[in-house]
Amino acid sequence: RTGGFSRTDEALKANAIHARQIAKQHGCAMFYMSQLSADAENKVVLNQAMMEGSRTGKAAEADLMILIAKNPPVEGQEEEDTMRHLNLVKNKLSGWHGIIHCNLEYKTARYVV
């Protein structure tokens, strides 16, 4: 459902604009979550072109974009790999772009460097 929009990407962009307006109105941070497309599967280095749906509309409204990747699966590996890669692909706040490699502590839901 696209809520009256002719295309899904238009609806997603409108949602991102609305979220940004709420954040500005209340002077707070707004977290907008989205999934990546199949292009990102099994990749550690990600970019905003891998976002599902509205690649440019959602990105245009963001001040900071963090895309989270995990290591590709290893054949025969039974234990879940907790290594995660935080790709900062857009950063209007400090300007720094890059990847932070860390571990996911799933019991506490924290990323630890």
Feature locations, PLM:
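P-loop NTPase motor core
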Residues: R1-H85
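Conserved P-loop NTPase
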Residues: L64, K70-V113
